[in-house]
Amino acid sequence: MLIAALGSSFAAGPTLKPVADRAAMRSSLNYPHRLATALGADLVDLTVSGATIGTILDTAQVIAPGVQFPPQIDGVPPTADVVTLTAGGNDLRFIGSMLTTAWRRYDPSARMGALLGPQYPGIPAPDPETIEALTGLLARVVTAARRRSPRARVVLVDYLTVLGPGSRSSLVDFAPAELAAFRALQDALEGAFRDAATRSGAQLVAVSERSRDHAVGSADPWVEDFVPDPRRTVGSFHPTAAGMAAVAELLVTGLR
């Protein structure tokens, strides 16, 4: 079996060690690697932290001067049996706005907040047009993956739940309106995956539904809380090692 993995940081695992590709901020313990190990499969891991649907479909992702990744879809082998996709959060500016708000709350004078501020001046509201556009883009990736590998089973893997109904960060006191805005983005992302699966006929593994009790602030979290260390802060509100293991396990079940 050959698996090709597409996606952004929720698939890549930006701060999990060991590191598979430093420029891509990709871990060798992310869910694609764990899935391949569990199934005894070969893996082409194309995930890159910070990816958008555009950098998966048709635009190079520039990491730094002289460092870039071609559109991920171009790397899908024609012989792939399974293609997984977890992306879209960056298109909605979900985690980026959450991290920026966390820094503003945690330490308004911190340099990190000033660095992130121009990119994320506020928490965006997901209007119907934006959600529809994201749904269409996810469906386009499914079509493109099938074009690259006609026999592949394309699987949409949505996002682990970051904020459950009663979630509270232990380090950041988000305002109720901020939490509501983040949940609106989270709900929009889940809906886009659900509708894209229906529209494209791709399989959906809804890890969001299975992780409601493992959100930030839970007894057994599958996502990190805010990480105030600037060297590791990119891992804030991202899957933990346990979260990646859980996603891989759900995929193993879903692929049977």
For each feature predicted by the language model, list its residue ranges:
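Short, solvent-exposed beta-strand-terminating loops
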Residues: 88-105, 158-165, 209-216
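Catalytic His-Asp segment of secreted/periplasmic serine-dependent ester chemistry enzymes
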Residues: 160-256
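Short, amphipathic alpha-helical "lid/cap" segments that border enzyme active or binding sites
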Residues: 73, 131, 135, 139, ...
